[in-house]
Amino acid sequence: MQDIKTYLSVAPVLTTLWFGSLAGLLIEINRLFPDALSFPFF
């Protein structure tokens, strides 16, 4: 039962960090390369 409580307390933290870093990465990519619609035409 303790393992389940540990998992339930760790999983939201890891997913928040993961999605936060993913959002930051996408924001930086869009800042460096503003028009992502032009990528398929290169």
Swiss-Prot record:
Gene3D superfamilies: Single helix bin
Keywords linked to the UniProt accession: Chloroplast, Membrane, Photosynthesis, Photosystem I, Plastid, Thylakoid, Transmembrane, Transmembrane helix
Bilayer topology term: Single-pass membrane protein
Function: May help in the organization of the PsaE and PsaF subunits.
Gene Ontology cellular component terms for the protein in this record: chloroplast thylakoid membrane; photosystem I
GO biological process, one term: photosynthesis
Predominant location category: plastid
SUPFAM superfamilies: Subunit IX of photosystem I reaction centre, PsaJ
Lineage of source species: Eukaryota, Viridiplantae, Streptophyta, Embryophyta, Tracheophyta
UniProt keyword Ribosomal protein present: no
UniProt-annotated location(s): Plastid, Chloroplast thylakoid membrane
Membrane-spanning ranges: 7-27
Cited InterPro entries: PSI_PsaJ (IPR002615), PSI_PsaJ_sf (IPR036062)
Name of the protein: Photosystem I reaction center subunit IX
Domain of life: Eukaryota
Family: Belongs to the PsaJ family.
